[in-house]
């Protein structure tokens, strides 16, 4: 198995997110200033989301298989509506009040499973990992010590400069929706 490095992940982030450009309305950008939506990086992010829409049936089949066994909520419907999400995302309910989320990046061969920190999560997480790796050969998880690292010079639609993590950039702000207990 290939080892995922910080440098590799930052290269992917910077390929899809412009450094030092705030994500704001065009009317708030000074004349001759950089506008986020006009950058080459943003264009590549939109292209990745377009590929994600085209390849959505693969994701849908995988989450249908998981949904046959677990209470599953697809968090990727925004992508189908034209959103620029960087990953497919879903949530599996472990209890009435606790869920884990998982994400398959559209920006590189990575996935993440965000665990809430309860005993019931381990067998479910293993099954999700097996399903992702069978559906998306070559994809690998991002270790928490790398994924939680803040990318100081990147902003996202709903995340201010200096607050986005590698996980958020490669998966989605949906990553933050599961809080460990």
Regions found by a protein language model. Name each.
Residues 2-136, 140-141:
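Extended, charge-biased low-complexity segments
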Residues 136-181:
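Acidic, proline/glycine-rich low-complexity IDRs
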């Amino acid at each position: 198995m290939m080892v995922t490095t910080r440098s590799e992940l930052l290269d992917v982030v910077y390929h899809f997110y412009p450094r030092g450009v705030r994500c704001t309305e065009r009317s708030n950008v000074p004349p001759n200033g950089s506008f986020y939506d006009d950058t080459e990086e943003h264009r590549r992010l939109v292209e990745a989301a377009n590929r994600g829409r085209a390849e959505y049936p693969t994701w849908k089949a995988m989450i249908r298989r998981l949904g046959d066994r677990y209470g599953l909520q697809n968090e990727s419907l925004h992508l189908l509506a034209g959103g620029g999400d960087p990953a497919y995302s879903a949530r599996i309910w472990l209890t009435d009040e606790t869920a884990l989320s998982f994400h398959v990046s559209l920006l590189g061969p990575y996935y993440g499973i965000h665990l809430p920190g309860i005993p019931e999560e381990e067998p479910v997480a293993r099954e999700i990992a097996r399903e992702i790796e069978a559906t998306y050969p070559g994809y690998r998880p991002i270790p928490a010590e790398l994924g939680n690292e803040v990318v100081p010079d990147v902003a996202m639609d709903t995340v201010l400069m200096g607050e986005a993590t590698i996980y958020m950039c490669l998966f989605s702000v949906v990553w933050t929706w599961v809080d460990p207990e």
